[in-house]
Amino acid sequence: MIKEGEKVKVDPRLTGLDEWIEGTVIDIEHNPFKGLVIAIRDKFNRIFFGEQKYFIPVNEDNVCMQ
């Protein structure tokens, strides 16, 4: 489960950019039509938001969870 303040990466299909963008979760909304909608801010202060399926948590400990 993704939480506010957590570091995540956002899929290029959502951003329209060439690579995954890393940012900090600034808002999580429970949308009755789309489900969980997540908003992040990256290091350039750009804000991206979309459905949960476009975001993956960043594992800062570099620990394999398999």
Protein language model annotation of sequence segments:
Residues I40-Q66:
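Intrinsically disordered, low-complexity, charged/polar segments
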Residues T15-D18, N31-F33:
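Short glycine/serine/proline-enriched coil/turn segments at secondary-structure junctions
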Residues E19-E29:
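Short beta-strand-centered aromatic/proline hotspots
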Residues F33-A39:
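Short aromatic-glycine-enriched beta-strand elements
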